[in-house]
């Protein structure tokens, strides 16, 4: 195989929401939310009963989604969604509940692909009556499409009508509510034509921002500019105001028009209507410098209509919500009112549901669902009304800005949270827990809501009850007494010499009149038929009827008089099969009268039976037709239970080891059959391997066997229910759960103690729980969410984290540097308070006493920084030490260095700067601060500070010394008594050193704008020499060495690429002991003498913030793990065989043709957004193969000379074998 080939897999999708719409997309009364997360569209369905949000659908569009808008045709009951993307096309999607998919209804091309400033797609607005839509670009271009129905009542879309305005920058577009008059769109725009022709710059300073109305004349099929009015030059957002005459209620819905949100003010504007303006109350901040104060902007808004009224919620950039109401007489406005409502995280989108919920799509971090407790009408907070000011507040003299102090939630209460890692600033995969797979330690979040997270692959478990038992049970069951019971009534525990029966009520207590035999251990418990119970014990079967009458069946005796025992059994609601120690199977079936009848013949197996299973009886059927039996000759046999071939053998499968447990379960997997559940036969082996095979419902043959190693312990399987669906638990050295999520079968470990046995549990206080045994302890627990496969353990941080470093010897100990711009540090707050010269009363302190985690840090002017260094125990999830930085010093880099000159003592070095200006990058002073680690690294002690000449952006340990990227210089420092000693430097780097990695004496340097530069340290001459670089300039964010000659790097535009040095160049550099030959080589293309060649290139679509070479599964190959700024986690898996490369690249090319992007983006062009994709296969695209129709799957598989099942199996092996996800 020539060169390197990689397979890209997304392990955790982006969590950053950039667009949100609400509507009745299913066509029912229930409202749903569609959110855009990078290249992914998700349909969320809030449960109005529980207040939980379920992710119903997640679809990768393979294109950048820029905007969303929902509309409904007049008289329709179903909402459609319009998508603006980087495809140069407008796309209308319809949600199909039957297939749980988004279907493309219309796709119209209007421009070039890519996110360009004059190609529409950035802004979308619809007419409130669903008659037209406007799609706009950042500059000049605006198109209007008419939406209508044809004779068959299908949605139609017209040709585009141009509403272009040359030399105009567009800031926002919104549809104006005019009832059934000609559709009207409002645009916020700036004309720069005069600025282009004025060399003095005066026209640029005086450029006016205008509110312009564009009218679509439905009669003439033409768009005209109807009205234009200058607005505040700092206006940034338009909000639609209800309007139009309501024929049903015989009254006006509202005054129509728009609210123009600008800095500190909100203004109502409409043609031929008086202006009304209200101020946006500002937070009371006594230490703010009023001369440098930055005004308050509105960043999100939502309109909510009720039967006879409407109101708006608008949100400022601090997260404060304000309620805006209007008084109007018919279609004329009387007054505009504003009032503080509550404070929530800053949102990219707000949605109010009719059921009384507010969905907050947070700009950073988790998405939140709140419930309205009240509408804030009855509290004593002041309300500001436009009529209280001169000229309704719209005169030349603007209303004075009132102040307020935010308070904890009063009108809202949080009911659900959808966790998100967005943004990830830095991450490290390590394994301090010594688990099967590494944990990812990530620095996430922004501002005071930041956190340091330990991410573990698995489902989170919430424990409800933990109780000690008198002994160690071998098994546990729960059962209802009758079929109609809503909840379980009994918990049955089997011990070596007896059985304990507990009743489930307000308390759990022992019962003696259950009818069960308690003097013997139990093998199985089943609720049988309508109202009977069944107990299988080693010496027989006990059938307990509803009137407590007991029917017994005893095991038969052998010819020598010894009684046989039951060694294995399986049951369902209507059937019972037991295996005797004489290697015979005995079959029982429930008749229509509720009697349990034994089938006359017994089946001799010819080998000892170890385990067996049959699925639940299908609804409306008398019996299930198949039984799986595992024997001690390492085979599994499928036995028929049909009346005409009872206990006849159908098929046999050989195993690599004897079976320890079998579980048959009917579960839905859309990659196998999207319409019906598939019968899976799960076989756990004694060597810790799990086999999953499919039982052919017609022939009874076992097909498509997949294997997975679970641990060193024999596997025990239990059929259970999770979130109302069939699931299978596999118990080995870890507990695993097989379940269906979004119509795909998942197999994920539980983050919980190792269970010895488990069963489903349903009680009034815990309706969807599970019960398990850990040693002699009984545990009752729930799985709150199946949506996320990563369990998050968090430590709260004070400011935005910048970099993390781990202690090399103390497992799980990390150091985080945090820095926040435009924020006052505690020391600066104290100094400014003292400068006021007076004691502030409680009501005057305003934001000084607020909790930053809830309300955000105290805002300050540009150039103010708050920063700290924190030692974190990642495993225990606690801060062990925190060091606040003062004097406007901010930390940007960190490294743990074992200095050779100090007998390998581990020191912490932090790179920081004072009075940092971000653009252009500058600082007053910069330092490398060295800390001694005390208490095994849990505390820090300042050793000394070393002043340097630029901001240290990256630090790294290197051969017992410190390697530092300080501005354009790369330096090596050693430890001195009073400061760090500069030993060596190279100042030839073009922009700034932002990333470093090293092997031996070779160093790879990531430059801020000029890609990767290879350097070598020559100890004889104590010299750092650069000898190779990249041909193309790239804005590097991270780099890591894959081997001595190969480096993987990522840039600011979402690309990952791999560079490799020529072998001869590499050898000649190493063979030159002084570096003099390299120094005198002729530079090529104004750079280094040698050029690295590009091996692989791929557009991920997210800015990469960490790159690491690591093995994700025990004994698995190493992969390149990356994390993205928007919360995504992915892996690039290297291929090991040419056959796999050929198969999957052919599959990828077929899927590019078959699987059209729902936004109309060409897949190859998307993955080659900045440079052509090279040597990387898109695993996310390949995995959509299972979602194609069976006919398409067969056609593509035929081209590859394979069956669809084999391709799905290969894709699953690549994902599970390399990443474990």
UniProtKB/Swiss-Prot annotation:
Compartment(s): Nucleus
Single GO cellular component term: spliceosomal complex
Keyword terms: mRNA processing, mRNA splicing, Nucleus, Spliceosome
Name of this protein: Pre-mRNA-splicing factor RSE1
Chief location: nucleus
Organism in which the protein naturally occurs: Mycosarcoma maydis (Corn smut fungus)
Function summary: Involved in pre-mRNA splicing and cell cycle control.
GO biological processes: mRNA splicing, via spliceosome
Name of a matching Pfam family: Beta-prop_RSE1_2nd
Stated family: Belongs to the RSE1 family.
GO molecular function: U2 snRNA binding
Subunit relationships: Associated with the spliceosome.
Superkingdom of source: Eukaryota
Record has Iron as a keyword: no
UniProt keyword Nucleus, yes or no: yes
């Amino acid at each position: 195989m020539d060169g390197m080939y990689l397979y890209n897999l997304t392990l955790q999708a982006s969590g950053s929401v950039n667009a949100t719409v609400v509507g009745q997309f299913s066509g029912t009364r229930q409202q749903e939310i569609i959110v855009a997360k990078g290249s992914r569209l998700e349909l969320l369905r809030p449960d109005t009963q529980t207040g939980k949000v379920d992710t119903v659908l997640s679809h990768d569009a393979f294109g950048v989604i820029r905007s969303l808008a929902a509309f409904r045709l007049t008289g329709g009951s179903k909402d459609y969604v319009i998508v603006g993307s980087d495809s140069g096309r407008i796309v209308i999607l319809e949600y199909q509940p039957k297939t749980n998919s988004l279907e493309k209804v219309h796709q119209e091309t209007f421009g070039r692909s890519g996110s360009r400033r004059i190609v529409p797609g950035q802004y979308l607005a619809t007419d409130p009556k669903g008659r037209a839509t406007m799609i706009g670009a950042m500059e000049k271009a605006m198109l209007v499409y008419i939406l209508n129905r044809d004779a068959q009542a299908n949605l139609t879309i017209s040709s585009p009508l141009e509403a272009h305005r040359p030399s105009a920058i567009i800031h926002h577009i919104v549809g104006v509510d005019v009832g059934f008059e000609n559709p009207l769109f409002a645009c916020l725009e700036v004309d720069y034509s005069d600025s282009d022709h004025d060399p003095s710059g005066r026209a640029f300073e005086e450029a006016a921002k205008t509110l312009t109305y564009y009218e679509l004349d439905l009669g003439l099929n033409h768009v005209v500019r109807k009205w234009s009015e200058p607005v505040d030059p700092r206006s940034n957002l338009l909000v639609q105001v209800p309007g139009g005459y309501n024929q049903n209620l015989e009254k006006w819905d509202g005054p129509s028009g728009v609210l123009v949100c600008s800095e500190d003010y909100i203004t109502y504007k409409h043609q031929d209507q008086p202006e009304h303006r209200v101020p946006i109350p500002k937070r009371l901040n006594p230490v703010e410098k009023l001369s440098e104060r930055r005004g308050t902007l509105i960043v999100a808004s939502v309109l909510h209509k009720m039967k006879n009224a409407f109101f708006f919620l608008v949100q400022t950039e601090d997260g404060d919500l304000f309620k805006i109401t209007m008084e109007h007489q018919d279609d004329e406005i009387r007054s505009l009112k504003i009032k503080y409502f509550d404070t929530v995280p800053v949102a990219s989108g707000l949605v109010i549901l009719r059921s009384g919920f507010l969905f907050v799509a947070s700009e950073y971090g988790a998405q939140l669902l709140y419930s309205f407790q009240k509408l804030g009408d009855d509290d004593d907070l002041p309300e500001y009304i436009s009529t209280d000011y001169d000229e309704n507040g719209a005169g030349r003299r603007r209303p004075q800005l009132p102040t307020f102090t935010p308070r904890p939630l009063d009108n809202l209460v949080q009911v659900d949270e959808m966790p998100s890692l967005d943004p990830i600033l830095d991450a490290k995969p390590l394994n301090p827990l010594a688990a099967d797979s590494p944990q990812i330690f990530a620095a996430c979040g922004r501002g005071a809501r930041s956190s340091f997270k330990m991410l573990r692959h698995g489902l989170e478990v919430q424990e409800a009850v933990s109780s000690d038992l008198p002994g160690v049970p071998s098994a546990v069951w729960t059962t209802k007494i009758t079929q109609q019971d809503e909840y379980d009534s009994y918990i049955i525990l089997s011990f070596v010499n007896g059985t304990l029966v507990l009743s489930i009520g307000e308390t759990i207590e022992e019962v003696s009149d259950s009818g069960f035999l308690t003097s013997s251990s139990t093998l199985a418990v089943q609720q049988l038929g309508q109202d009977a119970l069944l107990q299988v014990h080693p010496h027989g079967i006990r059938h307990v009827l509803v009137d407590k009458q007991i029917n017994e069946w005893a095991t038969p005796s052998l010819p020598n008089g010894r009684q046989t025992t039951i060694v294995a059994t399986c049951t369902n609601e209507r059937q019972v099969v037991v295996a005797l120690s004489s290697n015979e199977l005995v079959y029982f079936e429930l008749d229509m009268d509720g009697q349990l009848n034994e089938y006359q013949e017994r089946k001799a197996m010819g080998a000892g039976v170890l385990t067996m299973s049959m699925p639940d009886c299908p609804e409306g059927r008398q019996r299930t037709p198949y039984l799986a039996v595992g024997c001690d000759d390492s085979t599994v046999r499928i036995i028929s239970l049909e009346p005409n071939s009872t206990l006849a053998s159908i098929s046999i499968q050989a195993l690599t080891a004897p079976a320890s447990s079998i579980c048959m379960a009917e579960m839905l997997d859309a990659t196998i059959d999207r319409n019906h559940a598939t019968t899976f036969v799960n076989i756990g082996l004694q060597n810790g391997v799990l086999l999953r095979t499919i039982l052919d419902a017609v022939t009874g043959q076992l097909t498509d066997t997949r294997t997975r190693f679970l641990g060193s312990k024999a596997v025990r399987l239990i059929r259970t229910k999770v979130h109302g669906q069939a699931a299978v638990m596999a118990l080995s050295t870890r507990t695993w759960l097989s379940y269906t999520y979004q119509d795909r079968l998942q197999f994920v470990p539980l983050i919980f103690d190792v269970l010895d046995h488990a069963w489903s549990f349903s009680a009034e206080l815990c309706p969807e729980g599970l019960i398990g045994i850990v040693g002699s302890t009984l545990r009752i627990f729930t799985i709150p969410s199946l949506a996320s496969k990563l369990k998050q353990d968090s430590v709260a941080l004070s400011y935005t984290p910048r970099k993390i470093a781990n202690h090399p010897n103390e497992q799980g100990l990390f150091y985080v540097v945090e820095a926040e711009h435009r924020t006052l540090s505690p020391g600066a707050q104290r100094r400014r308070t003292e400068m006021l010269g007076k004691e502030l009363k409680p009501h005057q302190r305003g934001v000084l006493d607020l909790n930053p985690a809830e309300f955000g840090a105290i805002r300050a002017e540009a150039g103010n920084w708050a920063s700290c260094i924190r030692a974190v125990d990642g495993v225990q999830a606690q801060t062990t030490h925190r060091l606040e930085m003062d004097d406007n010093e901010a930390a940007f880099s960190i490294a743990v260095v074992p200095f050779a000159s100090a007998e390998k003592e581990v020191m912490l070095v932090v790179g920081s700067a004072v009075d940092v200006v971000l653009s252009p990058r500058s600082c007053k002073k910069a330092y490398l601060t060295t800390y001694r680690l005390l208490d095994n690294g849990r505390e820090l002690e300042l050793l000394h500070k070393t002043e340097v000449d630029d901001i240290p952006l990256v630090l790294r340990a290197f051969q017992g010394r410190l390697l530092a990227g300080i501005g354009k210089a790369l330096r090596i420092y050693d430890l001195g008594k009073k400061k760090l000693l500069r030993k060596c430097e190279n100042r030839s780097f073009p922009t700034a050193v932002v990333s470093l990695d090293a092997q031996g004496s070779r160093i790879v340097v990531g430059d801020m704008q000029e890609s990767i530069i290879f350097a070598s340290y020559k100890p004889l001459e104590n010299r750092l020499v650069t000898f190779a670089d990249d041909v193309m300039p790239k804005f590097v964010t991270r780099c890591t060495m894959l081997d001595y000659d190969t480096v993987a790097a990522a840039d600011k535009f979402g690309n990952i690429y791999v560079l490799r040095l020529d072998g001869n160049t590499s050898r000649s550099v190493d063979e030159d002991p002084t570096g003099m030959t390299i120094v005198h080589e002729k530079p090529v293309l104004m750079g280094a003498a040698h050029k690295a060649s590009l091996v692989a290139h791929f557009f991920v679509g997210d800015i990469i913030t960490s790159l690491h070479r690591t093995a994700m599964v025990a004994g698995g190959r190493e992969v390149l793990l990356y994390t993205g700024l928007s919360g995504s986690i992915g892996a690039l898996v290297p291929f090991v065989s040419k056959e796999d490369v050929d198969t999957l690249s052919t599959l990828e090319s077929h899927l590019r043709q078959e699987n059209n992007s729902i936004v109309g983006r060409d897949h190859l062009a998307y993955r080659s957004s900045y440079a052509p994709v090279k040597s990387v296969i898109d695993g996310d695209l390949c995995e959509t193969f299972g979602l194609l129709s069976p006919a398409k799957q067969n056609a593509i598989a035929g081209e590859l000379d394979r069956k669809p099942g084999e391709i799905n199996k290969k894709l699953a092996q690549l994902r599970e074998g390399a990443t474990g996800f």
